[in-house]
Every structure is written in C-alpha cells, then in structure tokens.
Amino acid sequence: RLQQRECSCPQSTHDLPEPNRNELEIRASARSSRVTARHLTQSCRLLLTTPPRLLAHQSTPKSGGFYLSTDYTCRANSPTRHYSKPALNENDLVKRYLERGLTIADRDRAARYLRHIGYYRLSPCTIPFQVDRTNHSFTPGTTFDDILNVYVFDRELHLLTTDALERVEVAVRAATSNIMSTHSGGGAFWYRDYSNYQNYKDYSATVKRIEHLTSLGRQYAPSTRREQTDRLHYPDALTHYLDTYTSPTTPPSWLVIELLTAGELQRLYADLARKYRKAIARELHLTEPVLQSWLKSYVRVRNICAHHGRLWNRFLGVYPAIPKSGTVRWLSDRSTFDTSNPEALERKRLYPVLVSLQSTLFTISPHSSWALRLQNLLEKHPRIPPNALSMRKGWAADRFWQDAFKAASQHE
C-alpha cells in the first residue's frame, strides 16, 4: 500500500507495480465474491418469502439484487392469464373513448393525436378523469382536450426541467474539472492519480472507462478522422488531441469531463476522495452528501426526460436528500418533506427535485427566470392539481420562491 501511494502517476492501470496491483486485485475480487454470494442468498430468500408486489419497495439498485421501479405493480400470486387484447387502430380507439363516456368534439382530430402520440402514452393522463378504474369510465363532462391538456403540461414540464438540469450539470462538470485540476495531484491529468480517489477499485474503473472512450477515437486513422468531422473544418476536441499529441495517451481533464455521460459524472464524483467531494460541493454552496444525493436524482430525472417519460403524477424511485444545513438554500419550512411530520409532502415525486434545482440556480445563475417560468407554467394549466407533483396550492408564497421571483425580475 505504501509503495502504491508513493509511485508516480501511472499512464495506465497496467503500469502499476505488478505485485502490488495483483495483491489489490485479489483482495478486491475476494471482497466482491463475498458480497455477491451474500446478496445472492438474500435475493433468493427475498423471492421465496416476499410477495412480488413488495419487492419493488424492498429492493434497490444499490443492493446488487433485483430492482423494480416504483411504478411497477404485480399480483401477489403468479400470473396465469394469457394476454389476448387485440391491437386497435386510432379510429377504434376513439370509439373506445366514446364508449367510456369521453366527450370528443372532433373525432378526426382525436384520431390524429392518437396516431402521432399513442394511446398508451396518453393513458396515464386519463386516470384523474376516470370515475371507475375497473371499467375505465370517465367522469361526466370530461373532454378529450382535458386529457390532452395534461399531456401538453407534462411535455412543457419536461422542457423546463431539462433546462435547469442542463445548467446544473454543466456547472458540476466545470467545478469538478476546475477543482481537481488545480487542487489535487496530477494537474490536468488528475484522474490518473490513484491518491485522488477513495480506493483502487474506483480509480481503476474510472481510468479504464476514460481509456475506452479515448480508444474509440483512435479507431480511425488521422486522415479518416478528419473526414469524419463537419464540413466547416472544426474538428472536435478529442480528434484534435489525438491528431496533435502522442502523450499522455488520454486527454486533459477538461476534455475528458465533457466525454462522460451524466451517470458517469455522478459516479466519478462519488468515487473521488471525500476532501475533493467537499470542495466541489462548496463551489456550488452545497454540502457533500447533499450534492451526491442530488446528482443521483438528476440522473434519474434526466433519463426520464430523455426517453420522453412522464414526470407528472409519478413516483421517481430516487429522490434528493433534504438539506439540514442552514447554508444550503431551501424552503422556509424545512419539515416540508420530513417523514416524521404527519402533514409532510410526498418526497418521491418531482417537487423536491424542482426545489433542489432552484437552490443550485441561486448560485450558478442568480438572476435566472426559471422560477418565474415554473410559476407561469402552473398558472397556464389551472386544472392540473399541484399535489400530483407533491406541491401545495400556496407553494409560490414560500420565501424561497419569493426570493427567486425577485432575483429574476431584476435581470437574467
């Protein structure tokens, strides 16, 4: 271990001193085998003793076992029925809506929306308007536009949420690269220095991933790579690095950090030594455990938005930690999402994520109009109940949001 800490920054995981690397890998493998066996035993016992409906609540991605999203529901008994529902075209689906009591003024228009959006995607939007969930009959007076309005609201909520996620993600990338490049060992190539990580396993996984990303760019000869760039002759940064430099074999961190996906960025932050995680969090006026939790939530919400999933009236499965420190901007009443508070709001829906995004925007974009746009969106759709997002009716009166509105009114 002392030899490992004293060795110079390796260019590859294979450049580590051989006996030391083997010892570390053997120990890591042994730990992994013990953990895998233990989780396998626990998973088998869980499957044998727990009704399938409860597995979604008892298994988590971190456990290494089965994971089902909170939207998943399953019968306690093993399924025995054969699925025999026929596929219907949009005109038949319009007739089904009419049979269930939905008012449709223009059938051709409704059929067009079903053709280009899909009956299945619209189905969750019909649930609040159903008087009977068994036969899916609608509350008298419900129109097709009522359902479409929910879908449009959710789509606009996607766009607004994605806007804030983009700003926060870019800020985290910049903070990680800046802090690690100037305050840690290794300079621009800090990610190759084992001492910057919690352990060898985290270090090894990160370096291997970056080497893999770089190797993808080396698959083409330099002349071929140049042909792959756009016609304006602005080659991407990785292509430029590979065509210009022979060493180090991987590019500097400010380039590498842009190659990572949001999920890889979140894992990289979690793998860093704690003192660096704290420094990066301070850059955003957050605490280390709060930022680590929020990043996990952002990856989940980002993936939902990227795949056009539903944000409205949905349990996310992963939710952000509620900050306890007074240094982190949050709602005036910090017990709003406290599970010990009988009047607390649901933590597993979108609202805590929205609050966390605005909390970070106070630092990275102090005069952003994002909060005002959120308020305008909800006012634009008054028939959308705020509790579907886990929001109270008077949510905008909180001093937290009032400060955001005031800052936005000054200038962007």
Regions found by a protein language model. Name each.
Residues 2-23:
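Extreme N-terminal basic, low-complexity initiation segments
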Residues 7-9, 44, 74:
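Cysteine-centered motifs
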Residues 29-31, 59-60, 65:
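Positively charged N-terminal leader segments that act as targeting/secretion signals
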Residues 22-29, 33:
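Short basic-hydrophobic amphipathic alpha-helical segments used for membrane targeting/insertion
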Residues 15, 20, 39, 57, ...:
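Intrinsic-disorder-associated, low-complexity terminal segments enriched in Asp/Asn/His/Tyr and depleted
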Residues 62-412:
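Long, contiguous internal "core" modules enriched in hydrophobic/ aromatic residues
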